[in-house]
Amino acid sequence: MTASADIRLSDVRFSYGETAMHFDVTITGGEIAAIVGPSGSGKSTFLNLIAGFETPQSGIISINGVDVTHLPLADRPVSMVFQENNLFAHLTVEQNVDLGRSPNLRLNEEDRKAVASALARVGLQGKEKRKPEALSGGERQRVAIARVLVRERPVLLLDEAFASLGPALRHQMLDLVNKLRRETGMTVLMVTHTPEDALHLDALLIFLDNGKIAAQGPATEMLSRAGPEALRHYIGEMRSF
């Protein structure tokens, strides 16, 4: 079981182009949070700061009480899944997951058992020897999630990981992630352009606007008629397209 880890961004400031971003928030360990907001509002930057792809100009980022602000990406207790390019095309499903245990693909018996267990948990038994090109989009993302499991990091970041999937398949993947979160205790942050995903998961919803956290709260409250006006306006604009 993966230990839960709080995530704290304390007065974190970062500039991207002409957008000055400011984040001050705590995500409780074991929670699932959905990050929503207009394009350019800072959603991916928010995740990149936590993952270590970006370094804040000021402020502190801590995970489980440990300051990781200047910790190298590889040393952070974080796994990240993107919409595309999560897998190596020349490796099999099994080998892609093996990388989560050993970058040189040298696994011991315990590692192999962990990989087999992860593939079973995401429903990929019998597909271990296939290459990514032989998989559907949903199956490829399941491989990426299996690799997350064998890495045993307490924080999972999803940057629009399921955006290219249809609604039914996207919900299947969200349900899988939520099931694994409950089993492992990991903290999950996901960027999505579909606020209803947060409702589907009964998640914490964090609404970003112009590089700042404009509102946050339980999705059931945030997406109700009594929710923040800025969020209602954003959703209304989305549905007008």
Swiss-Prot record:
<dbReference type="InterPro" id="IPR017871">
    <property type="entry name" value="ABC_transporter-like_CS"/>
</dbReference>
<dbReference type="GO" id="GO:0016887">
    <property type="term" value="F:ATP hydrolysis activity"/>
</dbReference>
<keyword id="KW-0997">Cell inner membrane</keyword>
<keyword id="KW-0813">Transport</keyword>
<protein>
    <recommendedName>
        <fullName>Thiamine import ATP-binding protein ThiQ</fullName>
        <ecNumber>7.6.2.15</ecNumber>
    </recommendedName>
</protein>
<dbReference type="GO" id="GO:0048502">
    <property type="term" value="F:ABC-type thiamine transporter activity"/>
</dbReference>
<keyword id="KW-1278">Translocase</keyword>
<dbReference type="GO" id="GO:0005524">
    <property type="term" value="F:ATP binding"/>
</dbReference>
<keyword id="KW-0472">Membrane</keyword>
<dbReference type="InterPro" id="IPR003439">
    <property type="entry name" value="ABC_transporter-like_ATP-bd"/>
</dbReference>
<dbReference type="InterPro" id="IPR003593">
    <property type="entry name" value="AAA+_ATPase"/>
</dbReference>
<keyword id="KW-0067">ATP-binding</keyword>
<keyword id="KW-1003">Cell membrane</keyword>
<comment type="function">
    <text>Part of the ABC transporter complex ThiBPQ involved in thiamine import. Responsible for energy coupling to the transport system.</text>
</comment>
<dbReference type="GO" id="GO:0005886">
    <property type="term" value="C:plasma membrane"/>
</dbReference>
<dbReference type="InterPro" id="IPR050093">
    <property type="entry name" value="ABC_SmlMolc_Importer"/>
</dbReference>
<keyword id="KW-0547">Nucleotide-binding</keyword>
<dbReference type="Pfam" id="PF00005">
    <property type="entry name" value="ABC_tran"/>
</dbReference>
<comment type="similarity">
    <text>Belongs to the ABC transporter superfamily. Thiamine importer (TC 3.A.1.19.1) family.</text>
</comment>
<feature type="binding site">
    <location>
        <begin position="37"/>
        <end position="44"/>
    </location>
    <ligand>
        <name>ATP</name>
    </ligand>
</feature>
<feature type="domain" description="ABC transporter">
    <location>
        <begin position="7"/>
        <end position="235"/>
    </location>
</feature>
<dbReference type="InterPro" id="IPR005968">
    <property type="entry name" value="Thiamine_ABC_ThiQ"/>
</dbReference>
<dbReference type="InterPro" id="IPR027417">
    <property type="entry name" value="P-loop_NTPase"/>
</dbReference>
<comment type="subunit">
    <text>The complex is composed of two ATP-binding proteins (ThiQ), two transmembrane proteins (ThiP) and a solute-binding protein (ThiB).</text>
</comment>
